[in-house]
Amino acid sequence: MILHAQAKHGKPGLPWLVFLHGFSGDCHEWQEVGEAFADYSRLYVDLPGHGGSAAISVDGFDDVTDLLRKTLVSYNILDFWLVGYSLGGRVAMMATCQGLAGLCGVIVEGGHPGLQNAEQRAERQRSDRQWVQRFLTEPLTAVFADWYQQPVFASLNDDQRRELVALRSNNNGATLAAMLEATSLAVQPDLRANLSARTFAFYYLCGERDSKFRALAAELAADCHVIPRAGHNAHRENPAGVIASLAQILRF
């Protein structure tokens, strides 16, 4: 079994760009940014429980990494950069710490490296279980209306929130719930030490209005790019800024 994805081919000899979306997104999420790099072959992946991979369920991050490896092999991707946002960024960090053959580097936008103590994990587990129950039992429009009121999305205006609620409500609540439970931050290990000892290139993107993830970025041994005029979802709020950062990274 492999993950559903959309592949677009560029010039031979350049590494692939493999894009991983955030929670409740899909393979289209990164395409406005990715299509600015037409010289590179691009793979836009649907994570388990999402888009064309909605019917795929996993028990945890190990399963996601295994599916990602098999998907890369199926497309004969031998050299690549991983680019992930939020949940996709966490998947990217987990997978790279576990080892991915052919990895050139990882670029994470607003991805959490992991909670650092049992109290934080217990609190996050309580919170995520409440969201899981809501995704299972309530209309998605109601759930996402509250989801986008969370402090991390404080930079969004009312129109942006309405647009995101409408877009994300096309998902399947049950498969979102299953993926949220399987990949909760509560069950993700703290990756800071592994990321510090890495042998691959590591870049971190965060919006200038995303104070939480700017603080987290400062804890990581990564080259950080702050995206102007953007909050947590920087590639949506300022795609040109993210394109500029990726272009700078890929020139090295």
From Swiss-Prot:
Enzyme class, broadest EC rank: lyase
UniProt pathway annotation: Quinol/quinone metabolism; 1,4-dihydroxy-2-naphthoate biosynthesis; 1,4-dihydroxy-2-naphthoate from chorismate: step 3/7; Quinol/quinone metabolism; menaquinone biosynthesis
Domain of life: Bacteria
SUPFAM superfamilies: alpha/beta-Hydrolases (SSF53474)
One GO term of the biological process aspect: menaquinone biosynthetic process
Pfam families: Abhydrolase_6
PANTHER family: 2-SUCCINYL-5-ENOLPYRUVYL-6-HYDROXY-3-CYCLOHEXENE-1-CARBOXYLATE SYNTHASE (PTHR42916), PROTEIN PHYLLO, CHLOROPLASTIC (PTHR42916:SF1)
Annotated function: Catalyzes a proton abstraction reaction that results in 2,5-elimination of pyruvate from 2-succinyl-5-enolpyruvyl-6-hydroxy-3-cyclohexene-1-carboxylate (SEPHCHC) and the formation of 2-succinyl-6-hydroxy-2,4-cyclohexadiene-1-carboxylate (SHCHC).
Sequence similarity: Belongs to the AB hydrolase superfamily. MenH family.
Protein name (Swiss-Prot/TrEMBL): 2-succinyl-6-hydroxy-2,4-cyclohexadiene-1-carboxylate synthase
Organism: Escherichia coli (strain ATCC 8739 / DSM 1576 / NBRC 3972 / NCIMB 8545 / WDCM 00012 / Crooks)
Lineage: Bacteria, Pseudomonadati, Pseudomonadota, Gammaproteobacteria, Enterobacterales
